[in-house]
């Protein structure tokens, strides 16, 4: 990174920024959530709709958040502040509510996201120690019993592994934006790609893999419905970390010479490519060994260990696979944490070290532990009929993210207006900018409203 005249650091290159954003958006969205949703929703039909949705709503919204973030180059709250407009024009202070909603959504997702990271560490350690023995083929019952014993019924074990994951995040974040986040993604993202490509090559060459590839790539058009498309549109927000300040915060470190249109398109396509590769990593092996692809959220943790137990060097590939999941989770978690840390630093004039400790410990105590206990010792505790874990997921993903994203689109279309166009004026795509602006102003809010209403019912 370099430092500009406002003493705010900037990414050292577009590649560094794109790698960081890719890390922020890949996470469990591409490696865990995308594959099981494909399995539940018609295979190729879901993949096709996801690619369309990335163009319809994903890339336009990436550009929205990039414009907001780079405009003032501040935290995700002050990005909606009264100094956003040129010539001293003021705006309502209530727009900052969007920033606070984004922070609340970030807290909600991290409350359960870090727990999933703890699950992955648990599996890696169990594979290495032999507690999860896949040296010989295992049955569905064995895989389920292991999951129930070590994930479902061992809250203190998961609390320990989640804390371990938090500590790894702390080590990276404590080194700052330059020495921590930027440097880590330079190594972690290439490593993730190497692991991912290696697993894809291994699995698409299995006997019978073509059946899985066909399921994955050949759309069943009878499965495509308006309801499914609305659902997929909503999943793109999760996949791209839209609506809770991540892209606003990361783009605030972009220099003014960077082409925001290029970075938005590259970000969207990078996320899509990684998600699609994750499917190639999983579905051929499922069909090779006759495992149903519609296992839902437990697909990775219950079905895939069965697959690995049938493979030559299955333990090695299982460790690589869960290592890949851990890297994806880590590159996302450090950037979501950074949204809150940056806000605390700039809003409360808090030193970075104190902001990191407050953020990580606060989420661990108020979010991670309740989410873990909510599926065990506190399983009778419900919030609006949902477990604590599921409530965090629902409230952040279905309500807060959607409302914040809706507000961002309206903010750019009706408040920033010409200022948003000026932020893109250094590019040569004047026609595209006009189309994008009107699309964001009139079409995107309607799409988000439809998704939001659909999520509620």
Swiss-Prot record:
This is Uncharacterized sodium-dependent transporter HI_1690. One of its GO terms (molecular function) is symporter activity. InterPro entries: Na/ntran_symport (IPR000175), SNS_sf (IPR037272), YocR/YhdH-like (IPR047218). The chain crosses the membrane at residues 18-38, 44-64, 101-121, 158-178, 188-208, 228-248, 273-293, 294-314, 316-336, 355-375, 396-416, 433-453. Putative sodium-dependent transporter. Keywords: Cell membrane, Membrane, Symport, Transmembrane, Transmembrane helix, Transport. SUPFAM superfamilies: SNF-like (SSF161070). Pfam families: SNF. Signal peptide: none annotated. It comes from Haemophilus influenzae (strain ATCC 51907 / DSM 11121 / KW20 / Rd). Belongs to the sodium:neurotransmitter symporter (SNF) (TC 2.A.22) family. It is found in: Cell membrane. It is a multi-pass membrane protein. One of its GO terms (cellular component) is plasma membrane. It comes from the Bacteria.
